[in-house]
């Protein structure tokens, strides 16, 4: 198996100039486990820092757009759409990020980065509610961040 980002032992950005611009879609998701009392505070908009879902949505969109600044070999590509879905459950929140582009390379890293930052923002917004008496987070857990769908030029 050839590693595309390594040549002669040196890390490099892959040349995609020969590729055609095609429609690209990637969907990533992740989950954050929270105390049920924290979930209630989010639903009732009683979190001191403000609207948790709105903040996570904005942070996630910003992260998608900044992905090439965070991941060294990630190409800067034209993002045409970013959409977040937040599914609030009794013990946590599932975050899904759909990213679209018309370009030479996929948008999986952008979708993964968006989900990751949205989840981290949720944690930051509710950390005062999640801490135990020692300042730890025994119930808070971010898990299963993954790409659930990738489409290139209409082909899954």
Curated annotation (Swiss-Prot):
Question: Could you tell me the Gene Ontology terms of the biological process aspect for this record?
Answer: Mo-molybdopterin cofactor biosynthetic process
Q: Which residues bind substrate?
A: 73-75, 109-110
- Native organism is Archaeoglobus fulgidus (strain ATCC 49558 / DSM 4304 / JCM 9628 / NBRC 100126 / VC-16)
The disulfides recorded in the entry are: none
Q: What the protein does? A: Catalyzes the conversion of (8S)-3',8-cyclo-7,8-dihydroguanosine 5'-triphosphate to cyclic pyranopterin monophosphate (cPMP).
* Top-level lineage group: Archaea
Entry protein name: Probable cyclic pyranopterin monophosphate synthase
**What Pfam families has UniProt attached to this entry?**
MoaC
SUPFAM superfamilies of this UniProt entry? Answer: Molybdenum cofactor biosynthesis protein C, MoaC
Q: Which family does it belong to?
A: Belongs to the MoaC family.
Show the catalytic activity.
(8S)-3',8-cyclo-7,8-dihydroguanosine 5'-triphosphate = cyclic pyranopterin phosphate + diphosphate
**Cited InterPro entries:** Mo_CF_biosynth-C_arc, MoaC, MoaC_sf, MoCo_biosynth_MoaA/MoaC, Mopterin_CF_biosynth-C_dom
Gene encoding this polypeptide?
moaC
The entry's active site is 124
Pathway given for this chain reads: Cofactor biosynthesis; molybdopterin biosynthesis
- Extract one GO molecular function annotation from the record: cyclic pyranopterin monophosphate synthase activity
Top-tier EC class: lyase
Alphabetic keyword roster: Lyase, Molybdenum cofactor biosynthesis
Q: Give the E.C. number(s).
A: 4.6.1.17
What interactions and quaternary structure are annotated?
Homohexamer; trimer of dimers.
